[in-house]
């Protein structure tokens, strides 16, 4: 069993569950930080539910609980987020929600984790951006703008932390192969999409000591799309 401790935000979503399982399979100690409550986590996982990561104080409290429980934190995996398709003539509610769910959660969790991550010999932050943010399509304005902001947060924070042991990177997936996406796009071949477990494997590499040479990277994980 590794001594490394990872905190996974949004750990009860489709991707979050895949990341948690990959971390457990790698022998890591895992904490799940999620807005949901009453969820069942795998054995040995520290479950911290009911956390609104758009609130900086709640984010700090959750990270403090992880450190109090395990005595350390080595990697923060910012999986929490959301998606909406909405055109710009009615975008305001979606705009605010996407920036809150995708950007503010990552910012607050990262700020809360900086002290313990700097104390780790191999501190890691991994964010989830989006390949769609590189060239937005119709109805994707709010979502891709928020993910573009995640990309820039990743690059900026990586520069700020270059003198420390902490690396900051982001994965940029295309379409994830989920039940919801299959239902929404029944005429598209899902074999070309990205399996959550495959994306989780890339995230776990970036979160590992082996990823020490990479920081500020925006890593496309696009399958065959």
State what each model feature region is.
Residues 12:
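Conserved glycine-rich cofactor-binding loop
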Residues 82-97, 119, 139-142, 182:
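Conserved mid-core segment of classical short-chain dehydrogenase/reductases
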Residues 110, 146:
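Active-site helix of classical SDR
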Residues 115, 159-163:
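Alpha-helical segment proximal to the catalytic Tyr-Lys
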Residues 130:
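Residue(s) in the substrate-gating loop at a strand-loop-helix junction
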Residues 135-141, 163, 192:
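Active-site loop immediately N-terminal to the catalytic Tyr-X3-Lys motif
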Residues 163-166, 170-171, 178, 187-225:
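C-terminal helical subdomain
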């Amino acid at each position: 069993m590794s001594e490394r401790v990872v905190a996974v935000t949004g750990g009860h979503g489709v991707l979050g569950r895949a990341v948690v399982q990959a971390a457990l399979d790698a022998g890591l100690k895992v904490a799940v930080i999620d807005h949901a409550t009453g969820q069942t986590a795998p054995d040995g996982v520290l479950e911290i539910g009911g956390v609104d990561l758009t609130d900086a104080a709640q984010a700090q409290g959750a990270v403090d609980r992880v450190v109090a429980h395990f005595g350390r934190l080595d990697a923060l995996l910012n999986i929490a987020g959301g998606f909406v398709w909405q055109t710009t003539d009615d975008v305001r509610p979606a705009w605010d929600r996407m920036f809150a769910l995708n950007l503010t959660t990552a910012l607050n969790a990262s700020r809360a984790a900086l002290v313990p991550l700097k104390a780790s010999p191999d501190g890691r932050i991994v964010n989830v951006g989006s390949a769609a943010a590189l060239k937005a399509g119709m109805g994707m304005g709010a979502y891709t703008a928020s993910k573009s902001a995640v990309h820039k947060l990743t690059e900026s924070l990586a520069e700020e932390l270059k003198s420390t042991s902490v690396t900051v990177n982001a994965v940029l997936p295309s379409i994830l192969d989920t039940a919801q996406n299959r239902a929404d796009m029944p005429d598209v071949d899902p074999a070309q999409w990205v399996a959550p477990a495959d994306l989780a494997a890339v995230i776990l590499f970036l979160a590992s000591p082996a990823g020490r040479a990479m920081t500020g990277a925006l890593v496309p994980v696009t399958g065959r799309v």
